[in-house]
Regions:
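Formylglycine-dependent sulfatase
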Residues: 2-3, 15, 20-406, 412-453
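Sec-dependent signal peptide recognition
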Residues: 7-15
Length: 453
């Protein structure tokens, strides 16, 4: 049975809080860790220094990565924004979360990371882009994050408004308020305030930046740093310089957040995870900047495809004393793993009734265990696209528009150029059969007595 009554979660809070506190003490902490999830928007795997970018600098992210673990095989759950975010919020595949397209709502009965951690005594906040569906059924607004476990919210509920990098208004809780400034600066300011107000409760802070989603824009002083450094098709509109400036400003704002954690003496017991919701886009609103800069290098594809460039994303995690500094994780990390991993960090476990697909990877990041042997799945059948994918170990199966299954060794062939299906017929057949069986688990009707859609 799915837990679908918010009162059930609140009623369980006292018991769960005791359990969480005991778990944290057993792990050597008197206080459960603060947890910070930083999500970039359409940032390519190759856009950050810790993955080899040299044309611009990301010193704060690189420093964080050096103090923790770089997740070399980190995968988003989807190739576009809303399905990806719903998946990591719930720990579920897109076919189980109820959000498979950009215009779908997160079902109200789904338990999010914020709800799960709040029931464990955490204060929760989301600052940034929510993007969990357009209004439906006569509602005036999309499903609100404060109805899904967040105590505080500041940002966009309407994803199309996130195209505006200098917004005139944002949502502060449920109110629309006037604002002025560059969006990622505003979000960081609010995060600094939240961290500064931290009291006795541990907190879960999710900050979903707008960089580097189109339309691209950045503060003039950042753009000037890169003007003339790239071969622009139109020097009067330095799109590549602007893209580099967006990523630089993103890194600068993350540095501000880390500095505030340090100032408050919180960094030593804070788990920080950084990633992107999907790969970089080569679409027209981006002006071709990501394509010219090869943001997804060395991978094939982009946002809205299930090639590595669409779903393999930058990732790193830092938790001093728990995650060894300077480590690299070559195990597969899927963003549906965040919910169970965060709960484990808080000293708790996932309620089986939530039917979470992800697994706790904290022992893997701590180098206490190998990654689980599992097959992971993706589907993208919307907006004129039709692609399916499955990964097990080094191998990835891709099926495009119902065509012949293609098999790639994405460790030795990360660009997915050499189809080895013919030389691995049994594995190709097994993965294709598993993919078909997975699709049959789609949740399209009533679950736990509730009509999910």
């Amino acid at each position: 049975m799915i837990i679908n009554d918010r009162r059930c979660l609140r009623a369980a809070g006292a018991f769960v809080l005791v359990f969480a506190a005991c778990g944290s003490i057993a792990l050597g902490y008197e206080h459960p860790p603060d947890i910070v999830l930083i999500v970039a928007d359409d940032l390519g795997w190759g856009d950050v220094g810790f993955n080899g970018r040299t044309e611009w600098s990301t010193p704060n992210l690189d420093r964080l990565a050096g103090q923790g673990v770089v997740l070399k095989r980190c995968y988003s759950a989807a190739t576009v924004c809303a399905p990806s975010r719903a998946a990591f919020l719930t720990g579920k595949y897109t076919i189980h979360s109820g959000v498979r397209r950009n215009d779908e709502d997160l079902p109200a009965e789904e338990v999010t990371i914020a709800e799960a951690l709040r029931s464990h005594g955490y204060a929760t906040a989301l600052f940034g882009k929510w993007h969990q569906g357009k209004p439906r059924g006569g509602r005036a607004l999309p499903v609100h994050p404060m109805d899904q476990g967040f105590d505080e919210f500041f940002g966009y509920t309407d994803a199309t408004k996130a195209w505006e990098k200098y917004p005139k208004t944002l949502r502060d809780g449920r109110r629309e308020v006037a604002v002025s400034g560059y969006i990622d600066d505003l979000l960081t300011d609010r995060a600094l305030d939240f961290v500064g107000r931290r009291q006795e409760k541990p907190f879960f802070l999710e900050i979903t930046y707008v960089a580097s989603h189109f339309h691209i824009a950045a503060p003039a002083e950042e753009v000037e740093r890169y003007r003339g450094k790239f071969r622009e098709s139109d020097p009067a509109r330095p799109l590549q310089a602007t893209y580099a400036a967006m990523v630089t400003r993103l890194d600068r704002n993350i540095g501000r957040l880390i500095a505030r954690l340090d100032e408050r003496g919180l960094a030593a017991n804070t788990l920080i995870v950084f990633t992107s919701d999907n790969g970089a886009t080569f679409e027209k609103g981006n002006g071709g900047a990501s394509s010219a800069l090869d943001s997804n290098r060395p991978f094939r594809g982009q946002k809205r495809t299930l090639w590595e460039g669409g779903i393999r994303v930058p990732g790193m995690a830092r938790w001093p004393g728990r995650i060894p500094a300077g480590s690299v994780c070559a195990e597969i990390v899927h963003l549906i793993d965040l919910l169970p991993t965060f709960l484990a960090a808080a000293g708790a476990t996932v309620d089986p009734s939530w039917h979470v697909d992800g697994v706790n990877l904290l022992p893997v990041w701590e180098r206490q265990a190998r990654g689980p042997q599992r097959t992971l799945f993706w589907e993208w059948q919307s907006e004129g696209y039709d692609q399916l994918a499955a990964i097990r170990g080094d191998f990835k199966l891709v099926v495009t528009r119902g065509g012949k299954p293609e098999l790639y060794n994405v460790v030795t062939d990360p660009e997915e150029r050499r189809d080895v299906a013919a030389s691995h017929p049994d594995l190709t057949r097994q993965l294709n059969d598993e993919l078909k069986a997975w699709l049959e688990t789609e949740v399209a009707g009533p679950v736990g007595g509730l009509d999910r859609r």
